[in-house]
């Protein structure tokens, strides 16, 4: 038997909403931009898979097909551009024990109307600065001063702040009202609730570092999978970066280091991340953890 089905998505690729009267709900976080990550693998034998997207004629889009091949085309229809991608005779991917994520091994399509990662970095920075995610809080500043008292070096201060946040802001995946998605909740909410997801823990550390006199910003990363050069939103985790006295940015992940000595989990070596810094940044990669650390 053959089963043929179609899926329709409107607007923001991750909204996955249908029959909603409020058009605002289809707007992506980065307004005016479109991006999608399309798996072209299957769990059951598939004769043909087709992905098609229409854009305004004046909108540019870049795309790339990874780990395989597909038929692709772009056609003009009235005032629209229609991109179509198709693959025939698809068989289920053979999985292996402890293999890498399928996004790193199986066919996938990535597309984005955002020209460069730097554009995404600048947007991420502005979004959270405009929202006031890291505004100081008197009672939190008092805790920061208490923690760094007697600490002489920048690394001593960074370490004590990172570990306090890691050990005292509990991970709790709950909805906490306005400010979901790419907008980090503010210092008052995080310090009062003492819980949240990765972005709330990272946001707490950024606030603490700023109140201690450091320059710190949020960063997006993808734990467990590679991030490609196409600037789509292939992220599932939020971390922090702090600017050291030598001018370089150091990544910090308080979510993954509670009750351990590391500041950046060694499980996240050679992992791509995108800092939301005021000057904008290209995609970065975390360093290899030195052997003497283990």
Labelled PLM ranges:
Residues 199-289:
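Hydrophobic/aromatic-rich core segments of domains that either
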Residues 188-191, 198:
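Noncatalytic alpha-helical scaffolds and linker/capping helices
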Residues 1-5:
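Short Pro-Gly-centered flexible turn/kink motifs
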Residues 132-140, 184-186, 230-231, 252:
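Extended non-catalytic domains of envelope/secretory-pathway proteins
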Residues 142, 177-186, 222-224:
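Short, conserved phosphate-binding/catalytic loop or strand-edge motifs used
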Residues 20-23, 27-31, 277-294:
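Edge strands and adjacent loops of beta-rich recognition modules
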Residues 158, 189, 217:
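Contiguous, function-dense segments enriched for cysteine-driven chemistry
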Residues 6-21, 27-35, 40-179:
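Secretory-pathway-linked proteins and extracytosolic
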